[in-house]
Regions:
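Acidic, metal/ion-coordinating pockets
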Residues: 1-266
Length: 266
C-alpha cells in the first residue's frame, strides 16, 4: 500500500533557526523518506516577522510550503513576495484584500494536497473572521479538487485549536493532518482524530531550548521584572527542530501514523 510521508516543522525562530534548517532539513528528508515538508516561518527573519531572504532560505533547504501567522505583516517589503509566491501562505481568515493567499492546492508526487493556514481569534486578533467559518467556505469551494488537506491553526488558546480541529475532522472535510502553531511549546497530545486526521495542538519551534520561546532568557526575565519594553534577541545555542512526522495512506487519505520530532545536532 502506497503512503505519503509528511513532515510539519514548528515555528522557525530567527537566523539561528533558519541556519539550523539549512544544515539539517535535506538530510532529515532523506533519512525519513519525506515526500513533503511544511514549515511555519512567520518568525524566521532577523528581528521578527518573515522576509524574502528567510523564506527563500527555507525553501532552498527543503521545505515545500511555508505557513505563517499574525506576524506575517511585520515587514511591508514582504507583501509583494506573498503576492508572487503561493507556496507561502498567510492566514486565510484575513480579508481577501490582504496580500497573498490563505490556501493553495499543490501537487505532491501526483496527489493534490490542500494546504490551509488559519488564525485563531482567542487572545489574538478578534477582528478577523472566525476560522470555523473560513474553513467551511474554503473546503466547500474546493470540494472535489483535492485528495486531502493539511491545516495550520495558528492560535494562542489550546481550546480553540482543539475545537477547530475536531470541527474540521467531524465534518469529514478530508483533512489528513491538522496541527497548531504559535506558542513555540511542543505539546505531547499527538493522536489520530475520529475521522482520520492526525492532530497535535502545537508543533513547538525550531529554536533554542535554553531560551524563553527562542528569545534570550535574560531579555524576557528583564521584561517581566521591569515591565519595560525590551529588544528581543534570539538565542543562538542549543537549537532543536520540533514538529511531527505523519504517514498518510493513499487508499483513503487518512493519517495512519503520527509521531513527534525532536532533532538536535550531535
Amino acid at each position: 500500500m502506497k503512503s505519503l510521508n509528511i513532515m510539519c516543522v514548528g515555528d522557525i525562530v530567527g537566523v539561528p533557526g533558519v541556519e539550523f534548517i539549512k544544515r539539517n532539513l535535506w538530510n532529515l528528508r532523506k533519512e525519513h523518506n519525506i515526500d513533503c515538508v511544511v514549515a511555519n516561518g512567520e518568525n524566521s527573519a532577523k528581528g521578527n516577522g518573515i522576509d524574502a531572504k528567510s523564506a527563500s532560505a527555507i525553501f532552498d533547504s527543503g521545505a515545500d510550503v511555508i505557513t505563517t501567522g499574525n506576524h506575517v505583516w511585520h515587514r511591508k517589503e514582504f507583501y509583494s513576495f506573498l503576492d508572487g509566491n503561493r507556496f507561502v501562505l498567510r492566514p486565510a481568515n484575513y480579508p481577501d484584500a490582504c496580500p497573498g493567499a490563505g490556501y493553495n492546492i499543490i501537487d505532491i508526487t501526483g496527489y493534490k494536497i490542500l494546504f490551509i493556514n488559519l488564525l485563531g481569534t482567542v487572545y489574538m486578533e478578534p477582528g478577523t473572521e472566525s476560522p470555523f467559518v473560513t474553513a467551511d467556505r474554503i473546503f466547500s469551494r474546493e470540494k472535489g479538487n483535492f485528495d486531502f488537506a493539511v491545516a495550520d491553526i495558528h492560535a494562542e488558546a489550546t481550546s480553540e485549536k482543539n475545537a477547530l480541529a475536531k470541527y474540521i475532522d467531524g465534518k469529514e472535510l478530508k483533512a489528513g493532518i491538522i496541527f497548531g502553531t504559535h506558542t513555540h511549546v511542543q505539546t505531547s497530545d499527538e493522536h489520530i482524530l475520529k475521522n482520520g486526521a492526525g492532530y497535535i495542538t502545537d508543533l513547538g519551534m525550531t529554536g533554542s531550548l535554553d531560551s524563553v520561546l527562542g528569545i534570550k532568557n535574560e531579555v524576557i526575565i528583564q521584561k517581566f521584572l521591569t515591565k519595560m519594553p525590551v529588544k528581543f534577541e534570539v538565542e543562538e545555542n542549543d537549537i532543536e527542530l520540533q514538529g511531527i512526522l505523519c504517514r498518510i495512506e493513499t487508499d483513503n487519505f487518512k493519517c495512519a501514523e503520527i509521531k513527534r520530532i525532536n532533532f538536535r545536532e550531535i
